[in-house]
């Protein structure tokens, strides 16, 4: 059911006004911070700190992926752009926000100009004017159930309508870089189990 819903959301990206389609990502704080940086007087460090404070006020935890940042620094091969990107805070789970909520969050941070945004305002920013796909499929926020949105669409799992017996698929693969005459057999041989059936799928809209 999740893969079906994702396919519908991807379809929306090309067939529905982009302002009506939300983003579902751990990197939502980064997207907001980059919009804040478009305003004069806001560098990356200041924007990152302000976004973290906004989410903290709303009761949503954020963190910098310190292991990824350390790995990039230790590699000695990371570009400055990659290092900068790794310093943005992320949520601990995929967060679903509409374009309006993202823009409004950035505007609120700029208007506050370093002042703390109150809890009620922060929660209102992240919980009004939802996107079309959010209204359809709902939203769950682990940190605060008040942000949850009931879905208007229920998508069932695809179910096989008859008994199916597992079959074994035998496969071989050739090594593209093997020298001629170096190896006479296959680069890989194996079997995988597979099943096939006629599927029954349905969705209901409230």
Q: Which residues make up each language-model segment?
A:
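RAMP-family (Cas7-like) RNA-binding scaffold and associated basic/acidic loop-rich RNA-contact surfaces
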Residues: 17-206
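N-terminal ordered "arm"
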Residues: 2-19
């Amino acid at each position: 059911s999740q893969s079906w819903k994702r396919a519908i959301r991807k379809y929306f990206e090309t067939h529905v006004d982009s302002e009506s389609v939300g983003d579902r990502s751990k990197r939502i704080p980064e997207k907001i911070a980059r919009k804040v940086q478009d305003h004069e007087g806001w560098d990356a460090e200041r924007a990152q700190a302000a976004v973290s404070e906004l989410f903290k006020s709303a009761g949503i935890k954020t963190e910098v992926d310190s292991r990824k940042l350390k790995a990039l620094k230790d590699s000695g091969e990371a570009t400055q752009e990659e290092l900068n990107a790794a310093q943005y805070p992320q949520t601990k789970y995929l967060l679903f926000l509409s374009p309006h909520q993202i823009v409004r969050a950035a505007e609120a941070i700029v208007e506050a100009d370093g002042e703390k945004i109150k809890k009620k305002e922060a929660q209102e920013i992240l919980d009004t004017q939802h996107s079309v796909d959010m209204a359809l499929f709902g939203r769950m926020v682990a940190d605060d159930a008040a942000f949850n949105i009931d879905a208007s669409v229920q998508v069932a799992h695809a179910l096989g309508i008859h008994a199916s017996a597992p079959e074994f698929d035998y496969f071989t693969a050739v090594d593209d870089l093997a020298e001629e005459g170096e190896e006479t057999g296959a680069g890989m041989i194996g079997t995988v189990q597979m099943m096939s059936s006629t599927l029954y799928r349905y969705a209901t809209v409230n």
